[in-house]
Curated annotation (Swiss-Prot):
Record's protein name: Zinc finger CCHC domain-containing protein 10
Keywords carried by this UniProt record: Metal-binding, Zinc, Zinc-finger
Region (Disordered): 57-173
Biased composition annotated in UniProt, kind: Low complexity: 88-160
GO molecular function: nucleic acid binding; zinc ion binding
UniProt source species: Rattus norvegicus (Rat)
InterPro entries cross-referenced by the UniProt entry: ZCCHC10, Znf_CCHC_sf
Keyword Zinc: yes
Zinc finger (CCHC-type): 21-38
Amino acid sequence: MATPMHRLIARRQAEANKQHVRCQKCLEFGHWTYECKGKRKYLHRPSRTAELKKALKEKENRLLQQSMGETNTERKTKKKRRPKSVTSTSSSDSSASESSSESETSASSSSEDSDADGSLSSSSSSSAYSSSSSSSSSSSSSSSDSDSSSSSSSSSSSESSSDDEPPKKRKKK
């Protein structure tokens, strides 16, 4: 039951509050929007979708820069590793070929020598070479493991590009 006194009090409070109210139409203080007699001011603001698109582009650029930085560091480390593995495999191949040729010569000399002492010394030397060749082959296998890991990373990148192709085919339909 709003008496005239209550209405008067409410009106005074509204007048007092008007001083702190901004009109949504003309963007001025001092009156309510429904009391506005001015024209609507045009305030240019980018749309929400434009702001979201801009934020998405920034995130994509950051991710691309991070991935490019990671691939650059991976390439640098791979470049450093490759020369080491190439030299180790070439040295292991040459040492393996030397050990096999020396073991053949020692085997032929042991067959020519009828002394037991000569055959023992040649067999011990061939076993020493075989152990060195096995260690070098293990180092070459570890380098081939690193090469296979780099090839698997390159194959995964080619697979990702092939993943992009099917949607293009779908768009052609």
